[in-house]
Amino acid sequence: VSASTSANSAPSSPAQKKGIPLRFVTAASLFDGHDAAINIMRRILQGAGVEVIHLAHNRSVAEVVQTALQEDAQGIAISSYQGGHVEYFKYVVDLLKEAGAEHIKVFGGGGGVIVPAEIKELEAYGVERLYSPYDGQNLGLVGMIDDMIERCSLGTYSDVTVAATELSGDNGRNNLARLITAIERDELSPEQQSSLR
């Protein structure tokens, strides 16, 4: 499988136009040792120019969400072949909401394990997209990755109005991650820059 079609997609976000890649966290869910699928998706994401923080297999919701927050990721991609996916994905959405990070988009798949009714339920709950075997047949692997990239590119990036005074307290670490991203993307106003000095 070649990711060349993804790499040829025109950058659609301001950050991508500046050459700054999207950031994804990838993992297989808790008690799931089936990491072949997520490894393939991770490699295609990387081939498309996405920065990937790969957690491998058997990862808890807390680990995945905390990593996404600390890395200021735009997307999370999870494979789940072990069952328990409805609760797992809902908990991911819940923890992101609790952290004020609903801008992080959640994607997943699990072959035929996640049935159409569950896909509908989870997407209504807040999962951005769950890919079925039918999607794989119609879109192909690269097409699914292109869809993920497009959905994250159109999304809201981190709030760059984080001030130095907001780097303490419960959300201090999350705000610090957002601030670092804003600095990397050269998105701070002169006033914001001077408040950090």
Short names for language-model regions:
Residues 2-60, 197:
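Non-catalytic terminal/interface segments that mediate subunit docking, oligomerization
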Residues 31, 38-144:
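Cofactor-cradling patches in redox/metallo enzymes
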Residues 2-3, 142, 146-197:
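Extreme N-terminal, non-catalytic leader segments
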